[in-house]
Design a protein with these regions (language model features):
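Beta-rich strand-turn-strand
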Residues: 113-124, 171-186, 191-194
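Domain-scale signature associated with acetyltransferase and cell-envelope carbohydrate enzymes
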Residues: 1-137, 164-166, 183, 199, ...
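Conserved catalytic-core motifs of eukaryotic protein kinase domains, centered on the activation segment
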Residues: 140, 147-148, 179, 213-215
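Surface-exposed acidic, glycine/proline-enriched linker/cap segments
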Residues: 151-162, 166, 172, 225-229
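A short, glycine- and basic residue-enriched loop/turn
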Residues: 160-161, 178-179, 200
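Short conserved catalytic/interaction loops centered on acidic-Pro-aromatic/His motifs
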Residues: 139-146, 182-184, 198-201
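Histidine/lysine/aspartate-rich catalytic loop segments that bind and position anionic ligands
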Residues: 125-158
Length: 230
């Protein structure tokens, strides 16, 4: 090894932590600016569409909003939209509320790249997290009868959706009309939920089915354990 090797080796080693610190600083600054700008634009968009928004809203990325009904966001709601969240990053947070529809998202909820279409009522209760790329619908979008569908006649089935409080919906789930998901329930990633889920139950699959109840060590005091039935 030459003297020059000895001279330059420490310099190369010392540069690594410096570069890492610079990288971390840039990432932190980018996240901060992304969140500040995203939140400002989100509040502006929501105000234009007549939404009722609580304090402490935090948004990364740009929202898509269409509101002909009522849109209510509680305090401390956090949302990621687009590439702000790697999971489901090819999508954006999107709200579509038809005339007469009411979408309410409670305090402290978190959602990422979720598509919500509401024609009657969708309620996401406080402390509920909805993973990246989920879809929540309270409508079938079309008539069931093929002739009615082709002719555009008849009623489109709709039914309210209610989720939480403190529920967790894994990424890329689909929640269909008429579904109720109870307090503290967990829905496995990629599930299609078509029926009611009880409090502190774990469901997964397409269509989703009951897996088990949360064990006593996993759930608050007083909640039944894994041996409980549905």
């Amino acid at each position: 090894m030459t003297d020059s090797d000895h001279e330059f080796a420490p310099a190369k080693i010392s540069q690594k932590p410096v570069q890492r610190l610079r990288c971390l600083a840039c990432m932190a600054a980018n996240r901060y600016l992304h969140r500040r700008v995203g939140t400002f634009l989100a509040r502006l968009t929501l105000a234009v569409w007549g939404a009722e928004v609580g304090t402490g809203l935090r948004v990364r990325g740009r929202l898509r909003v269409h509101n002909e009904g009522r849109l209510v966001l509680g305090s401390g709601v956090q949302m990621n939209s687009g590439p702000a969240n790697f999971v489901g990053g090819e999508r954006r947070m999107a709200f579509w509320i038809g005339g007469g529809g009411e979408l309410a998202i409670g305090d402290g909820c978190g959602l990422s790249n979720t598509t919500i279409v509401c024609l009657r009522s969708i309620t996401i209760l406080p402390g509920t997290y909805v993973g990246g790329g989920c879809e929540i619908y309270d409508t079938d979008f079309h008539q069931l009868d093929p002739e009615d569908r082709l002719l555009g006649r008849g009623e489109v089935p709709v039914a309210p959706v209610r989720i939480g409080p403190k529920a967790f919906v894994g990424g890329f789930c689909i929640i269909l009309k008429g579904v109720t998901i109870g307090e503290g329930a967990i829905i496995g990633a990629g599930s299609v939920v078509t029926k009611a889920v009880g409090p502190y139950e774990i469901w997964a699959g397409a269509p989703a089915r009951f897996i088990r109840r949360l064990a006593p060590r996993e759930a608050p005091a007083g909640v039944g354990g894994a041996g409980a039935t549905t």
